Design a protein with these regions (language model features):
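Short glycine-rich anion-binding loops that position phosphate/pyrophosphate groups of nucleotides
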Residues: 56-58, 100, 218
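Gly/Ser-rich oxyanion-binding loop with an adjacent helix/lid
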Residues: 95-105
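Thiamine diphosphate
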Residues: 1-94, 206
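Glycine-rich ThDP/TPP pyrophosphate-binding loop and its adjacent helix/strand module
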Residues: 90, 104-121, 125, 129-250
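A generic structural signal for short
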Residues: 24-25, 69, 97-99, 154-155, ...
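Cofactor-binding loop segments of dinucleotide-utilizing enzymes, especially the Rossmann-like FAD-
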Residues: 54, 98, 125-127
C-alpha cells in the first residue's frame, strides 16, 4: 500500500521572528497575529508598515514580529496612528488593540478617528475581558458573562449597563469607509476574517478612508473554560451579540 504524499498547507509567516510567546494556551490573539502577518506579506507592504500597539496581552507581540511598531498608552493608539499616517502618508498604518484598551479606555479616540476619516486601519481583538489585568469586565463583555468583577451574577444590564457594539457604532459614522467583524474560533471563521481584513487593508491602500475590523478572540483563562471548549463558548455567548458580517463597505 503506497503512502499518500504529504503537502505542507501552511508555514510560519516570514514576518514572525519566533513562535514563542507569553500568552496563555488556547488564546486566540496569536492566531489573529498570524493572519495579519500573512496579509502584510501577501500585500507586500511589510517594509513600509507601522503597527501602533495598545496595552494588553498582545503587547507581547512587538518583540516577535519583523515590522516597525509604535507603543501607545492605554486607549491612545488611534491618535498615535493618526499622527503617524499624517506625517508619513506613504506608510501602511494599523492599530492593534483589545476591547479593554480600545472600547473601555479609548472610546473617544476610535470614534473621533473614524469621524475624521483617518486613513489607517484599526484592528480590535475582542475577548470581552481585561485579560492582562486579571479578567475584569470590559464594555464589550456580553450580558450574563462571568468575569472577575461579575463573578456571582454575570453581567447584568441594570447594574453594569449593556455591551457596546463598537463595530455597529463605527459603521454609523460618516467618516468610516469599511467596517466588519470576524473571529478566530473555527477554520471557516479564520478564513472569513482573513478575507475581511484583506479588504480593510486594501481600503487603506486605495486611500478610501478609515477601515475597521473587529476580531473575536478566545480567552479560556478568563472565561473559565478549557481551551477546547472556547469555540462553543463563542457560539453560545458571543454570536448573538456580535455576528460575523460586513457592516459597511465602499
Amino acid at each position: 500500500m503506497s503512502t499518500p504524499e504529504l503537502k505542507k498547507v501552511s508555514a510560519k509567516p516570514d514576518l514572525l521572528l519566533s513562535t514563542h510567546h507569553s500568552l496563555c494556551p488556547g488564546c486566540g490573539e496569536p492566531l489573529a497575529l498570524r493572519v495579519i502577518l500573512e496579509l502584510l506579506g501577501e500585500l507586500d507592504v511589510a517594509e513600509r508598515t507601522i503597527c501602533v500597539c495598545g496595552i494588553g496581552c498582545y503587547t507581547a507581540f512587538p518583540g516577535i514580529i519583523d515590522i516597525d511598531v509604535l507603543q501607545a498608552l492605554h486607549g491612545r493608539a488611534p491618535s498615535v496612528a493618526t499622527g503617524a499616517k499624517r506625517v508619513l502618508p506613504d506608510r501602511f498604518v494599523f492599530t492593534l488593540q483589545g476591547d479593554g484598551d480600545m472600547v473601555s479606555e479609548g472610546l473617544q479616540e476610535i470614534i473621533h478617528s473614524a469621524a475624521r476619516g483617518e486613513r489607517f486601519t484599526a484592528v480590535l481583538l475582542n475577548n470581552g475581558v481585561f485579560g492582562e489585568t486579571g479578567g475584569h469586565m470590559t464594555t464589550t463583555s456580553v450580558l450574563g458573562q462571568r468575569t472577575k468583577t461579575t463573578m456571582d451574577t454575570g453581567r447584568i444590564a441594570e447594574k453594569h449597563g449593556y455591551p457596546i457594539k463598537i463595530a455597529d457604532l463605527l459603521a454609523q459614522v460618516d467618516g468610516s469607509a469599511y467596517v466588519a467583524r470576524g473571529a478566530m474560533h473555527t477554520p471557516s471563521a479564520i478564513a472569513w476574517t482573513k478575507r475581511i481584513l484583506g479588504e480593510a487593508f486594501r481600503v487603506q491602500l486605495e486611500g478610501q478612508g478609515f477601515s475597521f475590523v473587529e476580531i473575536l478572540t478566545m480567552c479560556p483563562t478568563d472565561w473559565y473554560v478549557e481551551p477546547a471548549e472556547t469555540p462553543d463558548w463563542i457560539e453560545r455567548n458571543f454570536a448573538g451579540t456580535y455576528p460575523l458580517k460586513i457592516l459597511k463597505h465602499p
